[in-house]
Protein backbone atom coordinates (compact mmCIF):
# COMPACT_ATOMS: atom_id res chain seq x y z
CA UNK A 1 0.00 0.00 0.00
CA UNK A 2 1.38 3.40 -0.98
CA UNK A 3 1.94 5.84 1.87
CA UNK A 4 -0.39 8.80 2.22
CA UNK A 5 1.41 12.13 2.06
CA UNK A 6 -0.20 14.62 4.43
CA UNK A 7 0.98 18.23 4.53
CA UNK A 8 0.27 20.21 7.70
CA UNK A 9 0.40 24.02 7.34
CA UNK A 10 0.24 26.54 10.18
CA UNK A 11 1.75 29.90 11.05
CA UNK A 12 0.68 31.35 14.39
CA UNK A 13 1.25 30.37 18.00
CA UNK A 14 -2.38 29.29 18.66
CA UNK A 15 -2.40 27.18 15.48
CA UNK A 16 0.90 25.58 16.45
CA UNK A 17 -0.36 24.66 19.93
CA UNK A 18 -3.40 22.94 18.45
CA UNK A 19 -1.65 21.34 15.47
CA UNK A 20 1.37 20.04 17.42
CA UNK A 21 -0.51 17.06 18.94
CA UNK A 22 -1.84 16.22 15.46
CA UNK A 23 1.64 16.38 13.88
CA UNK A 24 2.94 14.07 16.62
CA UNK A 25 0.04 11.65 16.07
CA UNK A 26 0.59 11.62 12.30
CA UNK A 27 4.30 10.96 12.84
CA UNK A 28 3.43 7.88 14.92
CA UNK A 29 1.86 6.41 11.76
CA UNK A 30 5.02 6.66 9.64
CA UNK A 31 4.49 3.17 8.19
CA UNK A 32 1.40 4.42 6.35
CA UNK A 33 1.65 8.23 6.44
CA UNK A 34 4.42 10.60 5.35
CA UNK A 35 3.99 13.89 7.22
CA UNK A 36 5.25 17.17 5.73
CA UNK A 37 5.18 20.10 8.16
CA UNK A 38 5.14 23.64 6.74
CA UNK A 39 5.18 26.79 8.87
CA UNK A 40 4.52 30.23 7.42
CA UNK A 41 5.85 31.92 10.58
CA UNK A 42 3.01 34.46 10.58
CA UNK A 43 4.06 34.78 14.28
CA UNK A 44 7.83 34.24 14.37
CA UNK A 45 9.05 34.32 17.97
CA UNK A 46 5.91 32.93 19.57
CA UNK A 47 5.65 30.16 16.96
CA UNK A 48 9.24 29.04 17.57
CA UNK A 49 8.52 28.66 21.30
CA UNK A 50 5.77 26.15 20.56
CA UNK A 51 7.81 24.18 18.04
CA UNK A 52 10.61 23.86 20.59
CA UNK A 53 8.23 22.79 23.36
CA UNK A 54 6.79 19.95 21.27
CA UNK A 55 10.12 19.14 19.57
CA UNK A 56 8.73 19.67 16.06
CA UNK A 57 11.16 20.54 13.25
CA UNK A 58 9.36 21.92 10.17
CA UNK A 59 10.22 20.54 6.75
CA UNK A 60 9.62 23.98 5.26
CA UNK A 61 9.74 27.41 6.94
CA UNK A 62 8.34 30.15 4.69
CA UNK A 63 9.43 32.84 7.18
CA UNK A 64 6.98 35.41 5.84
CA UNK A 65 6.91 37.77 8.83
CA UNK A 66 7.98 41.37 8.29
CA UNK A 67 7.40 44.69 10.02
CA UNK A 68 4.03 46.42 9.70
CA UNK A 69 2.60 43.85 7.30
CA UNK A 70 -0.98 44.18 6.14
CA UNK A 71 -3.34 41.24 5.75
CA UNK A 72 -2.83 41.60 2.00
CA UNK A 73 0.96 41.35 2.43
CA UNK A 74 0.64 38.18 4.50
CA UNK A 75 -1.83 36.58 2.11
CA UNK A 76 0.16 37.32 -1.03
CA UNK A 77 3.42 36.04 0.50
CA UNK A 78 1.81 32.75 1.52
CA UNK A 79 0.19 32.29 -1.89
CA UNK A 80 3.49 32.83 -3.69
CA UNK A 81 5.75 30.87 -1.32
CA UNK A 82 3.53 27.89 -0.54
CA UNK A 83 2.59 27.19 -4.16
CA UNK A 84 6.03 25.81 -5.21
CA UNK A 85 6.16 23.67 -2.04
CA UNK A 86 2.82 22.03 -2.84
CA UNK A 87 3.83 21.57 -6.48
CA UNK A 88 7.07 19.88 -5.39
CA UNK A 89 5.64 17.62 -2.65
CA UNK A 90 2.30 16.75 -4.31
CA UNK A 91 0.52 15.89 -1.03
CA UNK A 92 -2.66 13.82 -0.92
CA UNK A 93 -4.16 16.29 1.55
CA UNK A 94 -3.28 19.65 3.10
CA UNK A 95 -4.37 20.13 6.71
CA UNK A 96 -5.07 23.65 7.96
CA UNK A 97 -6.36 24.87 11.28
CA UNK A 98 -9.00 27.31 12.40
CA UNK A 99 -9.27 30.83 11.08
CA UNK A 100 -5.97 32.64 10.53
CA UNK A 101 -4.78 34.30 7.35
CA UNK A 102 -2.44 31.32 6.96
CA UNK A 103 -5.47 29.00 7.13
CA UNK A 104 -7.34 30.68 4.30
CA UNK A 105 -4.32 31.37 2.09
CA UNK A 106 -2.99 27.80 2.42
CA UNK A 107 -6.44 26.42 1.59
CA UNK A 108 -6.60 28.58 -1.52
CA UNK A 109 -3.17 27.38 -2.70
CA UNK A 110 -4.21 23.75 -2.12
CA UNK A 111 -7.44 24.33 -4.05
CA UNK A 112 -5.60 25.93 -6.98
CA UNK A 113 -3.41 22.80 -7.08
CA UNK A 114 -6.46 20.49 -6.82
CA UNK A 115 -5.20 19.02 -3.54
CA UNK A 116 -7.72 17.82 -0.95
CA UNK A 117 -8.13 20.07 2.10
CA UNK A 118 -8.80 18.95 5.68
CA UNK A 119 -9.97 21.72 8.02
CA UNK A 120 -9.18 21.18 11.70
CA UNK A 121 -11.50 23.13 14.05
CA UNK A 122 -14.05 23.59 11.29
CA UNK A 123 -17.50 25.09 11.69
CA UNK A 124 -16.97 27.81 14.30
CA UNK A 125 -19.17 30.84 13.62
CA UNK A 126 -20.21 34.20 15.06
CA UNK A 127 -22.14 35.04 11.85
CA UNK A 128 -20.70 38.57 12.07
CA UNK A 129 -18.21 39.09 9.27
CA UNK A 130 -16.26 41.74 11.20
CA UNK A 131 -16.21 40.05 14.61
CA UNK A 132 -13.70 38.58 14.93
CA UNK A 133 -11.91 40.26 12.04
CA UNK A 134 -10.58 38.80 9.78
CA UNK A 135 -11.05 35.38 11.37
CA UNK A 136 -14.78 34.94 10.77
CA UNK A 137 -14.46 35.20 7.01
CA UNK A 138 -11.18 33.25 6.96
CA UNK A 139 -12.92 30.21 8.45
CA UNK A 140 -16.08 30.55 6.36
CA UNK A 141 -14.08 30.71 3.13
CA UNK A 142 -11.85 27.84 4.26
CA UNK A 143 -14.93 25.70 4.89
CA UNK A 144 -16.15 26.52 1.38
CA UNK A 145 -12.87 25.15 0.02
CA UNK A 146 -12.45 22.13 2.32
CA UNK A 147 -13.14 18.47 1.54
CA UNK A 148 -12.98 17.00 5.04
CA UNK A 149 -14.20 18.80 8.17
CA UNK A 150 -12.94 18.08 11.68
CA UNK A 151 -15.60 19.78 13.81
CA UNK A 152 -14.68 20.14 17.49
CA UNK A 153 -18.29 19.98 18.70
CA UNK A 154 -21.78 18.99 17.61
CA UNK A 155 -22.71 22.66 17.28
CA UNK A 156 -19.81 23.23 14.89
CA UNK A 157 -20.99 20.25 12.84
CA UNK A 158 -24.50 21.72 12.70
CA UNK A 159 -23.10 24.99 11.34
CA UNK A 160 -21.30 23.14 8.54
CA UNK A 161 -24.43 21.15 7.67
CA UNK A 162 -26.46 24.37 7.41
CA UNK A 163 -24.02 25.51 4.73
CA UNK A 164 -24.91 22.45 2.62
CA UNK A 165 -21.74 20.44 3.07
CA UNK A 166 -22.30 16.64 3.08
CA UNK A 167 -22.61 14.99 6.48
CA UNK A 168 -20.31 12.19 5.33
CA UNK A 169 -17.45 14.72 5.13
CA UNK A 170 -17.81 15.91 8.76
CA UNK A 171 -16.32 14.21 11.83
CA UNK A 172 -16.88 15.51 15.39
CA UNK A 173 -13.45 15.10 16.97
CA UNK A 174 -13.28 17.32 20.04
CA UNK A 175 -10.65 20.04 20.09
CA UNK A 176 -6.94 19.34 19.79
CA UNK A 177 -6.33 22.09 22.38
CA UNK A 178 -7.27 19.53 25.04
CA UNK A 179 -4.77 17.06 23.55
CA UNK A 180 -2.07 19.72 23.97
CA UNK A 181 -2.95 20.28 27.64
CA UNK A 182 -2.39 16.63 28.38
CA UNK A 183 1.16 16.99 27.06
CA UNK A 184 2.06 20.19 28.93
CA UNK A 185 0.51 20.49 32.42
CA UNK A 186 2.88 19.30 35.16
CA UNK A 187 2.36 18.96 38.91
CA UNK A 188 5.95 19.94 39.74
CA UNK A 189 6.02 22.98 37.43
CA UNK A 190 7.80 26.18 38.49
CA UNK A 191 8.18 29.60 36.85
CA UNK A 192 10.02 32.67 38.12
CA UNK A 193 6.83 34.75 38.12
CA UNK A 194 5.45 32.42 40.83
CA UNK A 195 8.20 33.70 43.14
CA UNK A 196 6.80 37.23 42.78
CA UNK A 197 3.25 36.24 43.78
CA UNK A 198 1.75 36.18 47.25
CA UNK A 199 0.36 32.63 47.70
CA UNK A 200 -2.42 34.06 49.89
CA UNK A 201 -3.78 36.14 47.02
CA UNK A 202 -6.04 35.13 44.12
CA UNK A 203 -4.18 35.24 40.81
CA UNK A 204 -6.04 36.46 37.74
CA UNK A 205 -4.38 35.51 34.46
CA UNK A 206 -5.08 37.98 31.65
CA UNK A 207 -4.55 37.77 27.90
CA UNK A 208 -5.80 40.37 25.42
CA UNK A 209 -4.55 40.95 21.90
CA UNK A 210 -7.26 40.67 19.25
CA UNK A 211 -7.19 43.13 16.38
CA UNK A 212 -10.77 44.31 16.95
CA UNK A 213 -10.01 45.04 20.63
CA UNK A 214 -6.92 47.16 20.01
CA UNK A 215 -7.33 50.84 20.75
CA UNK A 216 -10.17 52.14 22.91
CA UNK A 217 -11.77 48.77 23.87
CA UNK A 218 -8.44 47.47 25.18
CA UNK A 219 -7.64 50.68 27.03
CA UNK A 220 -11.08 50.62 28.66
CA UNK A 221 -10.54 47.06 29.92
CA UNK A 222 -7.04 47.84 31.20
CA UNK A 223 -8.34 50.88 33.07
CA UNK A 224 -11.08 48.80 34.70
CA UNK A 225 -8.57 46.09 35.59
CA UNK A 226 -6.25 48.54 37.33
CA UNK A 227 -9.16 50.02 39.29
CA UNK A 228 -10.19 46.52 40.42
CA UNK A 229 -6.68 45.69 41.63
CA UNK A 230 -6.62 48.98 43.56
CA UNK A 231 -9.99 48.18 45.16
CA UNK A 232 -9.37 44.48 45.87
CA UNK A 233 -6.24 43.87 47.99
CA UNK A 234 -6.79 40.08 47.72
CA UNK A 235 -5.95 39.82 43.99
CA UNK A 236 -2.87 39.88 41.79
CA UNK A 237 -2.80 40.01 37.99
CA UNK A 238 -0.37 38.24 35.68
CA UNK A 239 -0.46 39.43 32.06
CA UNK A 240 1.86 37.95 29.42
CA UNK A 241 1.81 40.90 27.03
CA UNK A 242 1.46 40.17 23.31
CA UNK A 243 4.33 41.42 21.12
CA UNK A 244 2.03 43.72 19.09
CA UNK A 245 3.30 47.32 19.55
CA UNK A 246 -0.29 48.55 20.03
CA UNK A 247 -0.87 46.04 22.84
CA UNK A 248 2.52 46.74 24.45
CA UNK A 249 1.87 50.48 24.49
CA UNK A 250 -1.60 50.20 26.02
CA UNK A 251 -0.48 47.67 28.66
CA UNK A 252 2.53 49.72 29.75
CA UNK A 253 0.53 52.97 29.84
CA UNK A 254 -2.38 51.65 31.89
CA UNK A 255 -1.09 48.61 33.79
CA UNK A 256 2.58 49.42 34.34
CA UNK A 257 4.18 50.33 37.69
CA UNK A 258 1.78 48.46 39.97
CA UNK A 259 3.13 46.04 42.56
CA UNK A 260 0.24 43.58 42.08
CA UNK A 261 0.10 43.70 38.27
CA UNK A 262 2.87 41.65 36.67
CA UNK A 263 3.46 42.44 32.99
CA UNK A 264 5.66 39.66 31.63
CA UNK A 265 7.02 38.48 28.28
CA UNK A 266 4.81 36.20 26.15
CA UNK A 267 4.90 32.68 27.55
CA UNK A 268 5.57 29.48 25.72
CA UNK A 269 2.75 26.97 25.76
CA UNK A 270 4.23 24.96 28.63
CA UNK A 271 4.46 28.03 30.86
CA UNK A 272 1.06 29.39 29.88
CA UNK A 273 -0.83 26.16 30.51
CA UNK A 274 0.84 25.66 33.87
CA UNK A 275 0.30 29.24 35.03
CA UNK A 276 -3.32 28.95 33.92
CA UNK A 277 -3.71 25.83 36.05
CA UNK A 278 -2.46 27.81 39.07
CA UNK A 279 -4.67 30.87 38.52
CA UNK A 280 -8.01 31.60 40.23
CA UNK A 281 -9.74 32.63 37.02
CA UNK A 282 -8.80 33.87 33.55
CA UNK A 283 -9.77 36.99 31.59
CA UNK A 284 -9.11 36.67 27.87
CA UNK A 285 -10.14 37.49 24.32
CA UNK A 286 -8.38 34.33 23.09
CA UNK A 287 -10.34 31.53 21.48
CA UNK A 288 -7.96 28.81 22.60
CA UNK A 289 -8.14 29.85 26.24
CA UNK A 290 -11.93 29.45 26.14
CA UNK A 291 -11.41 25.80 25.21
CA UNK A 292 -8.47 25.01 27.47
CA UNK A 293 -9.64 26.54 30.75
CA UNK A 294 -12.57 24.13 31.40
CA UNK A 295 -10.12 21.22 31.46
CA UNK A 296 -8.18 23.08 34.15
CA UNK A 297 -11.31 23.93 36.17
CA UNK A 298 -10.87 27.68 35.62
CA UNK A 299 -13.73 30.11 34.87
CA UNK A 300 -13.13 32.44 31.92
CA UNK A 301 -14.41 35.99 31.51
CA UNK A 302 -14.40 36.54 27.75
CA UNK A 303 -13.31 40.06 26.80
CA UNK A 304 -15.26 40.10 23.54
CA UNK A 305 -18.76 41.05 22.44
CA UNK A 306 -19.21 37.82 20.45
CA UNK A 307 -17.82 34.30 20.63
CA UNK A 308 -17.69 31.46 18.14
CA UNK A 309 -17.58 29.10 21.11
CA UNK A 310 -21.16 29.20 22.45
CA UNK A 311 -20.82 25.67 23.88
CA UNK A 312 -18.74 27.06 26.75
CA UNK A 313 -21.28 29.78 27.49
CA UNK A 314 -24.10 27.21 27.52
CA UNK A 315 -22.08 24.80 29.67
CA UNK A 316 -21.31 27.61 32.11
CA UNK A 317 -17.51 27.56 31.80
CA UNK A 318 -17.41 30.97 30.08
CA UNK A 319 -19.07 34.32 30.67
CA UNK A 320 -19.24 36.77 27.77
CA UNK A 321 -18.27 40.13 29.27
CA UNK A 322 -17.25 42.41 26.40
CA UNK A 323 -15.10 45.50 26.92
CA UNK A 324 -17.39 47.92 28.77
CA UNK A 325 -15.40 48.86 31.90
CA UNK A 326 -18.45 48.92 34.18
CA UNK A 327 -19.45 45.41 33.09
CA UNK A 328 -15.85 44.16 33.42
CA UNK A 329 -15.63 45.45 37.00
CA UNK A 330 -19.05 44.19 38.08
CA UNK A 331 -18.44 40.72 36.62
CA UNK A 332 -15.02 40.47 38.28
CA UNK A 333 -16.53 41.57 41.60
CA UNK A 334 -19.29 38.97 41.33
CA UNK A 335 -16.88 36.13 40.55
CA UNK A 336 -14.54 37.14 43.38
CA UNK A 337 -17.30 37.47 45.98
CA UNK A 338 -19.79 34.74 45.00
CA UNK A 339 -18.24 31.37 45.81
CA UNK A 340 -21.21 29.35 44.54
CA UNK A 341 -21.01 31.08 41.14
CA UNK A 342 -17.27 30.45 41.05
CA UNK A 343 -17.66 26.75 41.83
CA UNK A 344 -20.49 26.42 39.31
CA UNK A 345 -18.24 27.78 36.55
CA UNK A 346 -15.10 25.94 37.71
CA UNK A 347 -16.84 22.56 37.93
CA UNK A 348 -18.91 22.79 34.73
CA UNK A 349 -18.35 20.02 32.19
CA UNK A 350 -15.87 20.62 29.40
CA UNK A 351 -17.74 20.64 26.08
CA UNK A 352 -14.58 20.86 24.00
CA UNK A 353 -12.78 17.55 24.15
CA UNK A 354 -11.35 14.53 25.92
CA UNK A 355 -7.74 14.61 24.72
CA UNK A 356 -8.26 12.19 21.82
CA UNK A 357 -9.07 14.60 18.98
CA UNK A 358 -5.79 13.99 17.13
CA UNK A 359 -6.36 10.23 17.14
CA UNK A 360 -9.84 10.74 15.67
CA UNK A 361 -8.54 13.09 12.98
CA UNK A 362 -5.82 10.67 11.85
CA UNK A 363 -8.33 7.82 11.77
CA UNK A 364 -10.78 9.94 9.75
CA UNK A 365 -8.06 10.80 7.22
CA UNK A 366 -7.14 7.14 6.80
CA UNK A 367 -10.82 6.25 6.35
CA UNK A 368 -11.28 9.05 3.80
CA UNK A 369 -8.54 7.51 1.66
CA UNK A 370 -9.89 3.98 2.13
CA UNK A 371 -7.20 2.86 4.58
CA UNK A 372 -9.08 2.45 7.86
CA UNK A 373 -12.34 2.16 9.75
CA UNK A 374 -14.72 5.04 10.43
CA UNK A 375 -13.47 7.27 13.25
CA UNK A 376 -15.45 7.10 16.49
CA UNK A 377 -16.80 10.59 17.17
CA UNK A 378 -16.48 12.75 20.29
CA UNK A 379 -19.66 13.29 22.30
CA UNK A 380 -19.83 16.41 24.45
CA UNK A 381 -20.09 15.88 28.17
CA UNK A 382 -18.02 12.69 28.18
CA UNK A 383 -15.41 12.50 30.91
CA UNK A 384 -11.78 13.05 29.96
Where in this protein do the model-derived segments appear?
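Nucleotide-activated sugar donor-binding and catalytic core shared by glycosyltransferases
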Residues: 1-239, 244-384
Amino acid sequence: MEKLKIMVVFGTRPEAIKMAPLVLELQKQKEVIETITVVTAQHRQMLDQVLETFNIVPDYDLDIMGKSQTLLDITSKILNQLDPVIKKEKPDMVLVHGDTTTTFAASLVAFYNQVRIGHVEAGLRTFDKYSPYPEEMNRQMTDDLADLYFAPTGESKANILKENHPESSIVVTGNTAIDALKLTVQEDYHHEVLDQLDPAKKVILVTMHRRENQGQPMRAVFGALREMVDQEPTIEVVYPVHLSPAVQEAANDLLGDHDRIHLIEPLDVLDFHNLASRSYFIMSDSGGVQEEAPSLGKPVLVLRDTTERPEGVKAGTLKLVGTDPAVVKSTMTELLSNESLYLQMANARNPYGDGKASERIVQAIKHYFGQGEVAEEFHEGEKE
